[in-house]
Curated annotation (Swiss-Prot):
One protein family per Pfam: RNase_P_p30
Quaternary organization: Consists of a catalytic RNA component and at least 4-5 protein subunits.
Function: Part of ribonuclease P, a protein complex that generates mature tRNA molecules by cleaving their 5'-ends.
SUPFAM superfamilies: PHP domain-like
EC number: 3.1.26.5
Gene Ontology CC terms: cytoplasm; ribonuclease P complex
Lineage: Archaea, Methanobacteriati, Methanobacteriota, Stenosarchaea group, Halobacteria
Keywords (A to Z) from UniProt: Cytoplasm, Endonuclease, Hydrolase, Nuclease, tRNA processing
Enzyme class (EC, first level): hydrolase
Domain of life (superkingdom): Archaea
Designated name of the protein: Ribonuclease P protein component 3
Organism field: Halobacterium salinarum (strain ATCC 29341 / DSM 671 / R1)
Family label: Belongs to the eukaryotic/archaeal RNase P protein component 3 family.
Length: 232
């Protein structure tokens, strides 16, 4: 199971500190989901912390015109590409973008989803994120609203059997919560223990799949370059 984190400069803690804390909490690795690049070397941090560090990115989607090009450029170098939209209509745009792995925090900051968006995500293989940050780090009405949005998302995801990931979205090592603690949050929105853990493992599956696609041996799904294949 992996956690998806925001490291310095987007967050308060370094990649190394987040990786070490996540490993201690029971994770096998982290996906670094910053808006931009970090100076950390994933391989070096992984060797020092005994946690796999995946180079990810989050694309801010505020308009359709420029978003496709930004997603294309990030896809060339990042192992995991998430995109966060600024409106429900742009949530649909992201859900229909096959270069995107994860529609990040679709219910946050006034966001919303409906059956059309969830079905599009299923069709295009885009994972819908259950971002527990608003439950873990908010209180009062904000926490109630976050729970309400996540319950709605769960009902739609279950009904249409759409792919999903789960994250606490820690921006500091102090925000990292163990899988068991995230399971407890999941129970508040109607998830089972197995569903929350499956959502955490989905980051692992995405990283493994996309690393294969970025490797020199990959040609197309189901096809790898062998001894008789040569570059044209």
């Amino acid at each position: 199971m992996y956690e998806a984190v925001c490291a310095h400069p987007d967050g308060d803690s370094t990649v190394a500190r987040l990786a070490a804390t996540a490993a201690s909490a029971g994770y096998d690795g982290i996906v670094v989901r910053n808006w931009g690049a970090t100076s950390a070397d994933p391989d070096a941090v992984g060797a020092d912390t005994d946690a796999d560090v995946v180079r990810g990115t989050t694309v801010s989607v505020t308009d359709r015109a420029g978003a496709s090009e930004r997603i294309r450029r990030r896809r060339e170098n990042a192992v995991v590409v998430a995109a966060r939209a600024s409106s429900p209509s742009l949530n649909r745009f992201v859900a229909e973008s096959e270069r995107v792995d994860v529609l990040a925090a679709p219910m946050a900051d006034g966001g919303d989803v409906n059956h059309v968006i969830v079905k599009a995500a299923r069709t295009h293989g885009v994972r819908l994120e259950f971002d527990f940050a608003g439950v873990l780090r908010a209180s009062g009405g904000d926490r109630v609203q976050a729970l309400r949005g996540l319950r709605k998302l769960r009902e739609l995801v279950e009904h249409y059997d759409a792919p999903f990931v789960v994250s606490g979205r820690p921006a500091s090592h102090l925000h990292v919560r163990s899988p068991r603690e995230l399971v407890a949050v999941g129970a508040e929105i109607g998830f089972t223990d197995a569903q929350v853990r499956a959502g955490l493992r989905e980051w692992t599956h995405l990283a493994a799949r996309n690393r294969r696609r970025l490797s020199a041996e990959f040609i197309a799904p189901g096809v790898k370059r062998g001894r008789y294949e040569e570059d044209p």
